[in-house]
Amino acid sequence: MSVTVVLGSQWGDEGKGKLVDILSAEVDICAHCAGGSNAGHTIVVPVGPEDLRVPFAPQWCLLNPACTGLIGSGVVVHLPSLFSELDALAAQGLDCTNRLFISDRAHLVFDFHRIVDGLKEVELGGSWYHWDNQKWIGPAYSSKASRSGLRVHHLFDDTFAEKFRKLVEGWFKRYGKFEYDTEGEILRYKVLAERLRPCVIDCVVYIHHAISSGKRVLVEGANALMLDLDFGTYPFVTSSSTSVGGVCTGLGIPPKMIGKPIGVVKAYTTRVGGGPFPTEQLNDVGTHLQEVGREFGTNTGRRRRCGWLDLVVLKYSCMINGFDTLNITKLDILDKLPEIKVGVKYLVDGKELSGFPADLDLLAKVDVEYATLPGWNTSIVDVTSCDALPENCRKYIEYIETFLGVPVEWIGVGPGRNSMLIKEVT
């Protein structure tokens, strides 16, 4: 009677989807607990030639016909985007409408949130980049936090139109009256509500009944720990809880039901947009990681910033999330590097910091102390067992395990779904 959770341990884009793909074959329910369409996933559909991007629908339920998808209470949902996604999947032969449920407590994202997001950026002069990829997430969570937002169950309330107008007027007062068809949007959502109605459930009752009935539940946490609203590099973060705590609050389950939290770790470090990045490499190494690793955003197409693996960040992430095991991804991207560095200490004026600092001004002053490990200078893409990995590759993994005190259970050695090695954990 437990839940398996897959969480990003860095700044996102660690490649959680592949592990979730593998684990989904043996579960009954796959869930999202927080975030929205700012978290992109690319899946290869087994029918049809196109890759599809699925920010909302748990992609594992799409690829496992015996699995049910659940969008939890902590998610903010833009219904037109959700239905557009479902229609695109149906066109590829993956009709999951009857296997996808959404919490009646989930908050709604509207088109005016996009407009407000843009107005906020203009107001700030582009000086403060928040991570939400212009997907309207910040203003939607702002409405939620100010207790003025609308939830899924409000769609079926006779007072929906009145509440919607009041919500829009509130933003008009904040930013001035921008161009927006309020009445047209109300009519559109009346239609969308009827399509949504069969999917709406009480998430708390549903998931507790499922767990008590012995159903196997898999959850992918939103984004990653370093983008968490409380524990990330604030204000360069998203607007929700991306830690293991967000799983509990987003689905309505107690901590004791989480049986196995798994941390996904890219073999190097990347991040999108602005914000501190202590191990960033603005040199040939960074360019190599970016180009060989094809580090471009799923949603935005923007280049990701790249750098060495930061074990200070990972230690911090392990402390907060309590990972049982780790999945290292994209290890093959390091194949051709003669030596590999990992950040092991943050120093300020020669003194080691005891943890990851909250103060970004202090973080900007850190000097990173690196450990240098030998590379393996050979391709591992075709390796099919952990024992067959080059010695220096195994030593790299062992160094990470020893530093963090958490075993590595899965190792990604290539882009394909089958390019994942399973390592025995004792």
Curated annotation (Swiss-Prot):
SUPFAM superfamilies: P-loop containing nucleoside triphosphate hydrolases (SSF52540). It is found in: Cytoplasm. Mg(2+) binds at D13, G40. IMP binds at D13, E14, G15, K16, N38, A39, G40, H41, R147, N223, T238, R302. Keywords: Cytoplasm, GTP-binding, Ligase, Magnesium, Metal-binding, Nucleotide-binding, Purine biosynthesis. GTP binds at residues 12-18, 40-42, 304, 330-332, 412-414. CDD domains: AdSS. The keyword Magnesium applies. Binds 1 Mg(2+) ion per subunit. Belongs to the adenylosuccinate synthetase family. This is Adenylosuccinate synthetase 2. It comes from Laccaria bicolor (strain S238N-H82 / ATCC MYA-4686).
